[in-house]
Curated annotation (Swiss-Prot):
Taxonomic lineage: Bacteria, Bacillati, Bacillota, Bacilli, Bacillales
GO MF term (any one): L-amino-acid oxidase activity
Protein name, per record: Putative L-amino-acid oxidase YobN
Keyword Nuclease: no
Cofactor(s) named in the record: FAD
Species of provenance: Bacillus subtilis (strain 168)
Length: 478
């Protein structure tokens, strides 16, 4: 595999790939961000591309909901923030001249409501005992973040000394550790509970420690975050002027057949139920492995044992978001300007608008953001019940004003969405070494991209990075 450095990828975004000496017809499965990136680069390099998309829109998990909200209001059901070190995402935003604003990820006034006690982040940071977690004597007086970093920072410092070499050492050393098994070695149950609740790590307890280390590089450094003003879906939409004639919507891949010189994708139209076959020189599969499991691959041995195992075992985390529109920004009167509230109630994390702080009129908050098992409990409820329970939880923080100010709401569960069958990839212990090496590797005439085919899971950066990598790979073929 040709390894591209980050700077190489930035240059490819700016200047494109070299013009192909051997133009091909390429089928791209999925019009998510990685599919759009690879198709855009390959089309510009002289290839003929056809994008087959099962849903009725482009963007995949980059999804912004504008209904049922009032004019110009929306919430991002998928990605909602961009760390300032995600250079590939920011480079595409610059290329398309998309407007951005700062995403306020946390403030000292963030409300914490846990163990029946309501306080502010700045108060908790001065006196962590205020929340009455039953921590051990040697853990008293330390915040959840301080406890977590006391363990992770030495490992992160070691990685940063020589990332190319030291990541491998860390992967090998901690390959069998989940976050939970690692924390259990050092901390009391009370401290682990506090870390899980306040740092949103409960969902990651069963995940690979190495996965958490990759994530913590973003959150331990005081990263700034941005959002695309007007909705994150403006990024995938920016590819459409170039690619709209290349996308066929409602075409769901049911079967894939490889020959010596060609690959055929058999699709069923999601509205008419009609079957159509598309044949080309190569295919790039960008859909999640959770959905690829349902696709018949012929001949059977055209995919290696290791690829099939990765498709079967790769772990996906559920994610559910609930957005609520209110008549006014009553949370700002309570001192919450952007940032988030954290609670051990079912809603868990609420994020408040970073834009137009102090403005009058309606606004939408991301009233609940949950992952993994915490998202699954919401999946058991109807849309109406989700909104009802969200308002009940918010009223425990803000009082009855939430009922009088309520306008409308909507929710989105990525596990219940048939074209993703989960929110994002998160390795279980061992998967980084056992499965990942086989995920991005081509199988005959079939190549692979998507956030799961990168090591930057759950971020647009991972999808973009894999889209560039696969386009570069395909463009170099004879």
């Amino acid at each position: 595999m040709n390894s591209l450095m980050n700077d190489d990828m930035v240059k490819i975004i700016r200047n494109g790939l070299s013009a192909s000496q051997h133009p091909k017809h390429i089928l791209v499965i999925g019009a998510g961000l990685s599919g759009l990136v690879s198709a855009s680069l390959l089309k510009n390099a002289g290839h003929r591309v056809t994008i087959l998309e099962a849903s009725g829109r482009a963007g995949g998990r980059v999804c912004t909901l504008r209904s049922p909200f009032s004019d110009d209001l929306y919430f991002n059901a998928g990605p909602m923030r961009i760390p300032n070190n995600h250079s590939l995402t920011l480079e595409y935003i610059k290329k398309f001249k998309l407007p951005t604003n700062v995403f306020i990820n946390r403030t000292p006034m963030d409300i914490i409501y846990a163990n029946g006690i309501k306080t502010r982040l700045q108060v908790f940071e001065r006196a962590p005992g205020i929340l009455r977690y039953p921590v051990a004597p040697n853990e008293q007086g330390k915040t959840s973040e301080e406890l977590m970093l006391s363990l992770l920072q030495p490992i992160l410092n070691f990685i940063n000394q020589n990332p190319a070499r030291n990541w491998r050492i860390v992967e090998e050393q901690y390959k069998n550790h989940s976050l939970s098994s690692f924390l259990n070695t050092y901390f009391s149950y009370g401290a682990i509970d506090m870390i899980g609740v306040l740092l949103d790590m409960e969902a990651y307890m069963g995940m690979s420690l190495v996965e958490v280390l990759r994530e913590s590089i973003f959150f331990s450094s005081p990263a700034h975050f941005y959002e695309i003003t007007g909705g994150m879906d403006l990024l995938p939409h920016a590819f459409l002027p170039q690619l709209k004639t290349n996308i066929l919507y409602h075409q769901k891949m049911m079967k894939m057949s490889q020959g010596e010189n060609r690959v055929t994708i058999h699709c069923q139209h999601q509205q008419t139920a009609e079957f159509t076959s598309f044949t080309a020189d190569l295919a790039i599969v960008t859909i999640p492995f959770s959905t690829l499991r349902f696709v018949k691959v012929e001949p059977y041995h055209s995919f290696s044992y290791y690829k099939r195992r990765a498709i079967r075992e790769l772990n996906y985390i559920s994610a559910t978001k609930i957005g609520i529109e209110f008549k006014s920004r009553f949370w700002e009167k309570a001192g919450q300007h952007g940032g988030k509230s954290i609670t051990d109630l079912p809603i868990r994390f609420s994020y408040y608008p970073s834009r137009n702080i102090g403005a009058n009129g309606h606004a939408v908050i991301l009233a609940s953001y949950t992952w993994a098992d915490e998202a699954l409990i919401w999946d058991s409820l109807s849309e109406g019940e989700r909104i009802q329970y969200t308002l009940l939880n918010l009223s425990e923080i803000y009082g009855d004003i939430v009922w009088s100010e309520f306008v409308s709401g909507t929710s989105f569960s990525w596990s219940q969405y048939p074209y993703s069958a989960g929110g994002f990839t998160a390795f279980e212990p061992g998967q980084e070494l056992e499965l990942y090496p086989y995920i991005p590797v081509p199988e005959g005439r079939v190549h692979f991209a998507g956030e799961h085919a990168s090591l930057t899971h759950a971020w647009m950066q991972g999808a973009i990075e894999s889209g560039i990598r696969v386009a570069y790979e395909v463009n170099r073929l004879p």
